Amino acid sequence: FVMIPYLDRAPSRKGKVRTVFVPYYLDGHDPLFGMSYYDLLIGMDVTVFPSYYEPWGYTPLESCAFHVPTITTSLAGYGEWAARQKEQGGVVVIDRNDSNFGEVTERIADALFRFSHLNAEETEKARKAAAAVAKKADWKHFFKYYREAYSIALTKAAARNLNPQKTTKRNTK
């Protein structure tokens, strides 16, 4: 996007929306907020995580779990998963690839514009939709996949141990 520290210094920035650049780990001990990430998160109206690559992407999920609608991309595993869910309004997933930087920027701006114009009832509906999507990502639903992956890994490791001479560089990774 743009150099975040300089975004709000632009002369054309006279609207109500402000970007805050915080170069700290939000553990409650920073000199700017003195609050944890989660305490700050619950006060937000919407979050934006325009990931270029994240295998899963916990930050958009955390936002949703705290009833904060979020904007993410198709290059985050969570975004890809959330796009397949039925709930609408709590998560905006923007298709992102190597060549659509301008389009991604415009779509994020459009989504923020739409969120900023929601009335109280629509905002509450978006918050509930975000929370509903987060509940679907609970470990009680995903743990079976973890166990399945773990079982596959153990089976492959056992096969390598039984046949060490057949182990190649390719299947040891």
Region annotations inferred by a language model:
Residues 1-39, 93:
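Nucleotide-activated donor-binding/catalytic signature segment of Leloir-type glycosyltransferases, i.e.
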Residues 42:
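Structured loop/turn residues at beta-strand edges in well-structured enzyme cores
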Residues 46, 50-128, 132-136:
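Catalytic binding pocket for nucleotide-activated donors in carbohydrate/polymer assembly enzymes
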Residues 139-173:
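C-terminal alpha-helical cap of glycosyltransferases
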